[in-house]
From Swiss-Prot:
Pfam families for this protein: Phospholip_A2_1 (PF00068)
GN (gene name): OC90
Region annotation Phospholipase A2-like 3: where it falls in the sequence: 373-425
Protein role: Major protein of the otoconia, a calcium carbonate structure in the saccule and utricle of the ear. Together with OTOL1, acts as a scaffold for otoconia biomineralization: sequesters calcium and forms interconnecting fibrils between otoconia that are incorporated into the calcium crystal structure. Together with OTOL1, modulates calcite crystal morphology and growth kinetics. It is unlikely that this protein has phospholipase A2 activity.
Location in the cell: Secreted
Comment block on domains: Consists of 3 PA2-type domains.
Protein name per the record: Otoconin-90
Amino acid sequence: MIAFLLTSVLMIPHAGGHPLDTPHLPQELPPGLPNNINITFFSGMFKNVESVAEIFDCLGPHFTWLQAVFTNFPVLIQFVNGMKCVAGLCPRDFEDYGCTCRFEMEGLPVDESDSCCFQHRRCYEEAAEMDCLQDPAKLSTEVNCVSKKIICESKDNCEHLLCTCDKAAIECLARSSLNSSLNLLDTSFCLAQTPETTIKEDLTTLLPRVVPVEPTDTSLTALSGEEAGHDQEGVGAARATSPPGSAEIVATRVTAKIVTLVPAGIKSLGLAVSSVENDPEETTEKACDRFTFLHLGSGDNMQVMPQLGEMLFCLTSRCPEEFESYGCYCGQEGRGEPRDDLDRCCLSHHCCLEQVRRLGCLLERLPWSPVVCVDHTPKCGGQSLCEKLLCACDQTAAECMTSASFNQSLKSPSRLGCPGQPAACEDSLHPVPAAPTLGSSSEEDSEEDPPQEDLGRAKRFLRKSLGPLGIGPLHGR
């Protein structure tokens, strides 16, 4: 009975469905799904026939972005069960909701719930890039409907990562509120805010086909730390489109002339963009391999900084990787004295992040915040204080790096001109009381933000320690 119902779901979108519903859905069972599906896949999930019917009623006639994310039914049903238990929501509640909570992504998120779907897609894209594929025989996510918690305890890195993707999405949806006016949203609304663009099409595999747009010329002004608190309004108001999407991380970027919404941390197909030196009239066409900024930390630990990369591109029309091997501190921890003002910007950014970490923020664990350019002014959203502080650091650094001159002679991956010890940061926030970290003993601790008094110190640091180019006093050790 269960196997029949599961198999029949594949045919739902083809029977009187919406034109957006899974036109590329395979006619056969997805790869990796055993032909002998049986009840053992759903142990503890279905108690009886009524519970089976309840789950399928929860799925609705077409289950939106989940069809694009999941490649097998056991994992899908497990997610739906967790979504219903923890968030009290069903996929049917998201029928053509917003611009991303639908099967085919039509734009960037228009509200908080829509952003949850976007981040869920992106998380699976990045997992696929790491060759982490879904295994229907391994359901590692543990859902506790009594405590309304999701536990990821698998020792396998890929299983743990995929579980974390689902956990973050469900918890995000649980915190969000649905806007019924965004159900069955006309897709023209998602595309209406991207004038003067040229449409290209990319074929994708496991995730839906998307419509990338060639960027137009843009500029960006950095946002202060205090403005970061209002960023979420910009995310909801500037509803432009930039649909990323495939399990191969075939992704895109949109830069509109007036309003820009940019998904971060994803590869480009090599769209032509304008590269600007210090003279805006001198431009050359080039392709960016990605729109993230990579920073080589201690122990050869590569850190991905999507927000900084997106802001740099939006502000300068230069690919972020051009800044990664500049001077002594751009793109790595570095050593010696900064070579020029731009190099000092990179060191200042590193110091800013270190101060935020001392407040108890584990930056590597923070969810991604969309970057928005409205009237050439950058904003990045953020729910928690830690997210807002990270946005403030990145925005200040992007403005600083743009204001400084770019000296081609200082761009070298060898860093031969950087002898000595790493420059020390000004200890503007010392002493800082210990704040709860994500490694605390309870799930509640992991969601806590730094105390308000520490946030005040951090904001003062961002305002006070940055000079004319956003650079604070630096001294060697």
